[in-house]
């Protein structure tokens, strides 16, 4: 195949390690499926933890038992979310680098998706910081603020899915 045909077809542009031969194997499909499962599981935690924060912000100061129960739930969920985040990111990195998904000309959607992932990592970190503040006895924001905060991962998921499926640029 001549070089001009390779350049015009983003799926064939890479050589060597990013060879198109590695792109569409059954193994890659398993990696992709596991990536989706771990992403969905991580997002479930990103959706639910701020709901626990809403309840923590609304709990009465004299309800020590309820506060401790909610804190225990939040702590366990945050740990579980972090464990799910690691393989989600690792498998995504594998798909991106080893299989060359999103590499090459005309793949600006991948740069935008990676920015979305960085923002999600920041959101995850902020959730951990808010949890520590609750554990220290501080109520950093109102329950209304946490209801709005809860919508952030929904918007980020919407952006990521549109970028991956539609590939607008």
Language model features: what each stretch is:
Residues 19-23:
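Generic detector of N-terminal low-structure segments
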Residues 24-169:
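Polytopic transmembrane helical bundles with strong interfacial aromatic enrichment
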